[in-house]
């Protein structure tokens, strides 16, 4: 989803429609696979700014897989040290397996490293399980 220009506003009510739709899509999702490039040892500022507009109550219990890309292995822990605490704040249900890929792990934007591909497959299975649990809990709450 392209948020378009204008994402840099300070208040949610000032978001232009494309950005407001992005935030609404995040809040209404059954699950999220979130990813960010890593710059200077942290997630991208605009990535964080998008989540500054998200209502924490709408993310509570949402299944999430955490992913990131960066210039090398020295950025790999950003997923655990930055993304996991952010989504912990939202009380999201995060898959235990996260995925980080560097330039040596991809060719033309596709994962080519066997170990990274295996982590991706594991994270997908975990996300499916979290979705199943989320649906059972949701059905119980609706009854």
Label each region the model flagged:
Residues 42-43, 74-75, 108:
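Secondary-structure boundary/capping motif
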Residues 15-18, 79, 112:
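Residue-level signature of the cytosolic catalytic core of signaling kinases
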Residues 64-103, 114-119:
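Short, glycine-/small-residue-rich phosphate/pyrophosphate-handling segment
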Residues 107-110, 122:
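Polytopic transmembrane helical bundles with strong interfacial aromatic enrichment
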Residues 1-6, 99-106:
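Short connector loops at secondary-structure junctions
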Residues 56-60:
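Short, conserved loop/helix-junction motifs that constitute active-site signature segments
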Residues 1-55, 118-121, 125, 129, ...:
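N-terminal beta1-alpha1-beta2 submodule of the flavodoxin-like/Rossmannoid cofactor-binding fold
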Residues 51, 84, 109-112:
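Juxtamembrane helix-loop transition sites at the ends of transmembrane segments
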